[in-house]
Amino acid sequence: MNVGRTVKVTQAVVDLKFEGELPRIFNALKSKLEYRGKELILEVSQHIGDNIVRCIAMDSTNGVSRNDEFVDTGAPISVPVGRSTLGRIFNVVGEVIDECGPLKGKYDLESIHRVPPSFTEQKIQEEVLVTGIKVIDLLAPYLKGGKIGLFGGAGVGKTVLIMELINNIAKAHKGFSVFAGVGERTREGNDLYHEMITSNVINVNEHEKSQAVLVYGQMNEPPGARARVALTALTMAEYFRDHENQDVLFFVDNIFRFTQAGSEISALLGRMPSAVGYQPTLATDMGAMQERIASTTSGSITSVQAIYVPADDLTDPAPAATFSHLDSTTVLSRQIAEMGIYPAVDPLDSTSQSLSAEIVGEEHYKVTSEVKRILQTYKSLQDIIAILGMDELSDEDKITVDRARKIQKFFSQPFHVAEVFTGMPGKFVSLSDTVSSFKGIVEGEYDHLPEAAFYMVGNIDEAIKKAELIKDETKVGAKS
């Protein structure tokens, strides 16, 4: 048994001295004593000479003192994988934390540090993943097996959008989802769990019938947990892909906190900071995780990653490091959120590599191009409208502005997960309905309908019904 003794504790970093063989980098070390009723797990990060290893703690180091003993497990942190993990909540070291008893059934243990699939194993799929959210399916469609980034500042709706995506995709595609809560609010993690129970994504009585696994390392936890929890969740997703031949959905909320935790650890390990105080290994850390999110001949992992943008600055090194790995970007705009349009997706900033006639089809591509042209024209006319008003525009421009406003309003959509707050039932809109509805708007088929009819509805038929209701209400108001 290889035992090390504590020589120094600096917040989440612990130095241990080993008399015998040094444990390898990434090996897990277990405490002999219990702290706050449980063992403390450390991960070896550096060999710093004189038989001393520097480790990152996966939980609080409160109570750890000099000469406390830690045992080398001889392997990296290993977590449970397999169908028995479905419907359960785990922490970074693979312990269940949902108070539903120990893990039942068969499961394997896998290391959280794994090698990405080789080039020969990887496979590119060109199939669109329908989300049921109009603005995404039309303007920035997601590819099966792709990497999607949800960019947005604080409070513009990233978490709600992720919750809706989990809900819609679980119901429509019946695939397994793995959710990594990285450094976000504990309340949101709790809300998501109960929302999944309500929508039958998680079955608390028969866990094996569930379709999701939750792995949490929330913002009250030390940086070690926040830096590794995404890898724990990814390991579980990889098992479903490789051994169950599943098309898995991997959600991360929030990838910025993964970078932030790495930055905290880097400072505690004594590394020289890089641009804006981030760790010098930012690109390496990000690449090591992102390269594991891949589609193979066995199955696929489609990842949706919420990315907090500090001070709404997309050039910040943390979001910028993520950009190069993504296939689609969904940018959430504060200006659109202030207009009351939810989801607050910016239609001109959001992009997708799958938006080509070969993948989405000729009609979809043409409708999207026309929608973007109308919105871009409207954007360029806004200064003129602000200074001179609508009356100074040409008749053609007036029609363009009218259609652009209807398109903007029609991008809004009631969400299933927000029914409690909005009082409106959620809508899942099929891709064919989305394309045909927007085609009708850009071709002027619905020019006679009022702008308000397009707000917070599903397909175009609902907008027509809403227009009739508005007309009837106007008549009643006029009579009274």
UniProtKB/Swiss-Prot annotation:
Asked whether the keyword Ribonucleoprotein is assigned, the reply is no
Instruction: Give the first-level EC class, as a single word.
Output: translocase
SMART domains per record:
AAA
**Cross-referenced CDD domains:** ATP-synt_F1_beta_C (cd18110), ATP-synt_F1_beta_N (cd18115), F1-ATPase_beta_CD (cd01133)
Single annotated GO MF: proton-transporting ATP synthase activity, rotational mechanism
Localization per Swiss-Prot or TrEMBL: Cell membrane
The reactions it catalyses are: ATP + H2O + 4 H(+)(in) = ADP + phosphate + 5 H(+)(out)
Keyword terms, alphabetized: ATP synthesis, ATP-binding, Cell membrane, CF(1), Hydrogen ion transport, Ion transport, Membrane, Nucleotide-binding, Translocase, Transport
Give EC number(s), comma-separated: 7.1.2.2
Q: Where does ATP bind?
A: 152-159
Bilayer disposition of the protein: Peripheral membrane protein
A cellular component term (GO) from this record?
proton-transporting ATP synthase complex
Q: Which InterPro entries match?
A: AAA+_ATPase (IPR003593), ATP-synt_VA_C (IPR055190), ATP_synth_F1_bsu (IPR005722), ATPase_a/bsu_AS (IPR020003), ATPase_alpha/beta_chains (IPR050053), ATPase_F1/V1/A1_a/bsu_N (IPR004100), ATPase_F1/V1/A1_a/bsu_N_sf (IPR036121), ATPase_F1/V1/A1_a/bsu_nucl-bd (IPR000194)
PROSITE patterns linked: ATPASE_ALPHA_BETA
Pfam families according to UniProt: ATP-synt_ab, ATP-synt_ab_N, ATP-synt_VA_C
Predominant localisation class = membrane
KW DNA-binding (keyword) present: no
Q: Which residues cross the membrane?
A: none
Regarding protein family, the annotation reads: Belongs to the ATPase alpha/beta chains family.
UniProt subunit comment: F-type ATPases have 2 components, CF(1) - the catalytic core - and CF(0) - the membrane proton channel. CF(1) has five subunits: alpha(3), beta(3), gamma(1), delta(1), epsilon(1). CF(0) has three main subunits: a(1), b(2) and c(9-12). The alpha and beta chains form an alternating ring which encloses part of the gamma chain. CF(1) is attached to CF(0) by a central stalk formed by the gamma and epsilon chains, while a peripheral stalk is formed by the delta and b chains.
Cited function = Produces ATP from ADP in the presence of a proton gradient across the membrane. The catalytic sites are hosted primarily by the beta subunits.
Name under which the protein is recorded? ATP synthase subunit beta
Native organism is: Wolbachia sp. subsp. Brugia malayi (strain TRS)
Supply the gene name: atpD
